[in-house]
């Protein structure tokens, strides 16, 4: 590999010859990033994206001013799904270097897992990768159970089984227990539930190509909560947390579920399927029932659930929904501390009743009369959370994946949200 390009930081503006808007300049010693104090982390990330665009694949972060957050901002912009890159990191104190190394290990795992093609990453592979990551950081403090295929039906996981039965690759439920207490009877502090749809064709409510071409990333919620648990463990999480990943393909076949089918869940709820492309909520319902049964203080589910959230927020924010104002405030405070983008969207009691069905208690999608799709999706999920008004957060992961590069990000997964959830778990 070529000699490293030195990247230094300066609080002085660039020479006037570079223009008044210049955020970096080039000299004989390398490249200098000119920080202005307004959005230094964003400036570093955008500059790193430009440096990668120049074809520079080996850099050395040099000089004063670098800390773990600034190094991480550079890497977020510099990393891309194609090619190899090498960064020589600056000298950091032990705590900051450990924090940076943990981000590189875990959040890069999240990005790489979401970017993996569906042919490589099916439901079973996703579950096993999650087990491997958590076991790597937690060792013998972890136990897990994987339930798949017809065993799901036999055990009453009808949402997950129904959605996944149309694929040759069996649907899978991962139930993982991180218990650092050593006490098998220790209370469960939190449950994390992730949507793990490893490819979403839309089923018989089939997607157009322009909406299907990124659907390998529809397991982004599962990857995010897995990464969050792993990252929280590296930050010293000392409470019992359970992880439920609901993993399946949503495909078309002679055995696939159909419009008008009715699913009966273990909590007695009957759901009429009127859109097979609203499958994420059907699989999450099974995970939320299991999570509620643990009686935890906190339930967080994460899912690339609706296009409506992306319409509202683009790919710039994750959408947050909760009936618990205090808990939502804590999550937003964690997001601010970690410099990650979350935005709260409305969720009210009336959203729970905006899913009418002529044949069942619930419809899996709102009608044209109720167009607040992200809020009605959250309302649907609330029917499967035993105490939905307290201790439950729903994250619609609209910032998980970008179909095209922008000034701060390459195309593909971002890893956003991992640090925020981990922060909340360890607060």
UniProtKB/Swiss-Prot annotation:
Any Pfam family hit: DUF3663
GO BP of this protein: proteolysis
Localization terms from the record: Cytoplasm
Cofactor note (record): Binds 2 manganese ions per subunit.
Residues holding Mn(2+) 2: 195, 200, 218, 279
GO molecular function: manganese ion binding; metalloaminopeptidase activity
GO cellular component: cytoplasm
Keywords tagged on the record: Aminopeptidase, Cytoplasm, Hydrolase, Manganese, Metal-binding, Protease
Enzyme class: hydrolase
UniProt cross-references to HAMAP family, sorted A to Z: Aminopeptidase_M17 (MF_00504)
Role noted for this protein: Probably plays an important role in intracellular peptide degradation.
Subunit structure and binding partners: Homohexamer.
Record's protein name: Peptidase B
């Amino acid at each position: 590999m070529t000699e490293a390009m030195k990247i230094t930081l300066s609080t002085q503006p660039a020479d006037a010859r570079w223009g008044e808007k210049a955020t970096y300049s080039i000299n004989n010693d390398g490249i200098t990033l000119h920080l202005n104090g307004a959005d230094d982390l964003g400036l570093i990330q955008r500059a790193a994206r430009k440096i990668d665009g120049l074809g520079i694949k080996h850099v050395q972060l040099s000089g004063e001013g670098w800390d773990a957050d600034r190094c991480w901002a550079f890497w977020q912009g510099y990393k891309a799904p194609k090619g190899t890159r090498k960064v020589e990191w600056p000298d950091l104190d032990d705590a900051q270097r450990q924090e940076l190394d943990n981000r590189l290990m875990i959040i890069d795992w999240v990005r790489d897992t979401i970017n993996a093609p569906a042919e490589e990453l099916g439901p079973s592979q996703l579950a096993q990768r999650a087990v491997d990551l958590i076991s790597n950081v937690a060792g013998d403090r972890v136990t897990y159970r994987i339930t798949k295929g017809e065993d799901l039906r036999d055990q009453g996981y009808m949402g997950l089984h129904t959605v996944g039965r149309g694929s040759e690759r069996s649907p899978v439920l991962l139930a993982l227990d991180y218990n650092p207490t050593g006490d098998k009877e220790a209370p469960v502090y939190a449950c994390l539930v992730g949507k793990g749809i490893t490819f979403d064709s839309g089923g018989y409510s089939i997607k157009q190509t322009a909406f299907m071409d990124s659907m390998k990333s529809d397991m982004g919620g599962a990857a995010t909560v897995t990464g969050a648990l792993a990252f929280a463990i590296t930050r010293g999480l000392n409470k019992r947390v359970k992880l439920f990943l609901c993993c399946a393909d949503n495909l078309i076949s002679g055995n696939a579920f159909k419009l008008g089918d009715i699913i009966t869940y273990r909590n007695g709820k009957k759901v009429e399927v009127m859109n097979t492309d609203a499958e994420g909520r059907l699989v999450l319902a099974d995970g939320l029932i299991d999570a509620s049964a643990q009686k935890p203080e906190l339930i967080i589910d994460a899912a690339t659930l609706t296009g409506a959230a992306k319409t509202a927020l683009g790919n710039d924010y994750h959408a947050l929904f909760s009936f618990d104002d205090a808990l939502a405030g804590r999550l937003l405070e964690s997001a601010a501390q970690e410099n990650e983008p979350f935005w709260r969207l409305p969720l009210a009691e009336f959203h729970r009743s905006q899913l009418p069905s002529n044949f069942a208690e619930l419809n899996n999608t709102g009608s044209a009369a109720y167009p607040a799709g992200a809020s009605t999706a959250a309302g649907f999920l609330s029917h499967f959370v035993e105490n939905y008004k307290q201790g439950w957060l729903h994250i619609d992961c609209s910032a998980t994946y970008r179909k095209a590069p922008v000034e701060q990000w390459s195309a593909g997964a971002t890893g956003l949200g991992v640090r925020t959830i981990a922060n909340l778990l360890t607060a």
